[in-house]
Amino acid sequence: MVTNKDNFCVIMGGGIGSRFWPFSRKTLPKQFLDFFGTGRSLLQQTFDRFKQVIPMENILIVTNDLYADLVKEQLPELKPEQILLEPTRRNTAPCIAWASYHICALNPNANIVVAPSDHLILKEGEFLAAIEKGLDFVSQSDNLLTLGIKPNRPETGYGYIQIAEAAGDNFYKVKTFTEKPELELAKVFVESGEFYWNSGLFMWNVNTIIKANEALLPELTSKLAPGKDVYGTVQEKQFIDENFPACPNVSIDFGIMEKADNVYVSLGDFGWSDLGTWGSLYDLSPKDEAGNVALKCKSLIYNSKDNIVVLPDNKLAVIDGLEGYLIAESDNVLLICKKDEEHTIRKYVNDRSEERRVG
């Protein structure tokens, strides 16, 4: 199935995943965890997926220095030069810009798919066909492409893409991007039929994204473009360590996709989910007749419904009379909170960090 040596994949794997605390922590973020007991972490599943359509030697992992050993342990088939290690976190635009310069040094004709490391894809065959079709689209045009997912509910945790006129077989010009709307607006979006979820998956030719960075993110370009003679060499890491921390902290959505006038979307339904929250994990997990989820743990549940329980496999959870709760334990932390209040988890993480600092 893998044929085109000009096709590359960049997997972004440097996030902390604080919304999945206490399981996902700075020392072991969610992309390195196996949530469903498959024997493969989210990162490994993402790699397994893309190596079916991208030459394995053309797959890059961009992550933080902290996770170098984790990536090497989970993906031992990668060569050291396929793992790009950021000295500090600077959001997705600098991450993608660096990977683009690196790839351009290897292959100035490269077509690139950029993907997060924590997505779940249930309809893999349809997804991979869309990736190949999208890479072909960007190889023949100076356009930036994203994948749009048909929404099945008014989700407030995703960004939305409004489509304009068609530009070929299932490709549409993007009219607007909207970041994580309130519930009422999300309902309007879904009912209109014009809006699709923003998957966070992108495709483009390497020269197209470099030109977009030059035009829309000149401050970022000024930090990374001077390294064009060292990308792909042994001097690259030193250059990045010295210059990457000075890059602006900006997302690819805000910095490029919302501002460029050559953005298109390919629409699909791949059984896609951004596994970003406990709520999304609950939605995807098998449930008992009362809507309770118990992941990889023993449980006795009475008079309760719509809960998610995630404990170490040597613990037994006995639950009576709860509705709509998250019960999660990892290491020395037990978290119990309303499932629909999980947006406060980042506050708990900050409070825990402050307690440790003061203590």
Residue ranges and their predicted role:
Residues 1-6, 207-357:
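Left-handed beta-helix
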Residues 1-11, 19-26, 37-116, 122-132:
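Conserved N-terminal catalytic core of the sugar/cofactor nucleotidyltransferase
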Residues 11-13, 62, 113-116, 146-150, ...:
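Short beta-strand segments
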Residues 43, 99, 118, 161, ...:
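Residue-level signal for inorganic ion chemistry
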Residues 112, 194, 201-202, 273, ...:
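A residue-level structural signature of the nucleotidyltransferase/glycosyltransferase Rossmann-like core
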Residues 124-244, 264, 314, 355:
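Conserved core of the sugar-phosphate nucleotidyltransferase
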